[in-house]
């Protein structure tokens, strides 16, 4: 989970996210990167900030990896539980079961990242939307 100092300006925080994602990609050299598509957020300010951060993530992924796969919340729920309306707790329990963990991963963002990775593994990455070689 990437965190940034709350006392930094938003543009600096975005730059820190880009640098952190780039460093992770350079360190682990993934062949592919999977991300969750943005969902509607009732808080407009939060939604816009999340969209900016997501854009930085996508830019780093395409620029440094080349293969980016995106999954909708519905695709993730169906892949993990077989039910498109599963709630967050049900999905987290499936992560715990799939990975043989004694408890649900914390923080929630870590569990969310694992859900996306498991969805990508489960679907075989057949939904790629972007590919740059």
Describe the role of every protein-language-model region.
Residues 1-133:
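Phosphate- and other anionic-substrate recognition elements at nucleic-acid/protein interfaces
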């Amino acid at each position: 989970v990437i965190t940034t100092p709350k006392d930094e300006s938003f543009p600096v925080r975005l730059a820190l996210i880009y640098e952190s994602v780039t460093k992770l990609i350079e360190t682990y050299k993934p062949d592919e990167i999977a991300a969750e598509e943005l969902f509607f957020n009732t808080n407009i300010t939060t939604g816009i900030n999340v969209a900016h951060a997501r854009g930085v993530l996508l830019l780093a992924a395409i620029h440094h990896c080349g293969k980016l796969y995106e999954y909708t919340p519905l695709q993730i729920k169906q892949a993990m539980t077989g039910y498109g309306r599963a709630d967050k707790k049900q999905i987290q329990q499936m992560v715990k079961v799939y990975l043989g963990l004694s408890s649900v991963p914390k923080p929630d963002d870590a569990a969310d990242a694992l859900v996306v990775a498991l969805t990508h593994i489960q679907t075989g990455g057949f939904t790629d939307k972007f590919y740059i070689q």
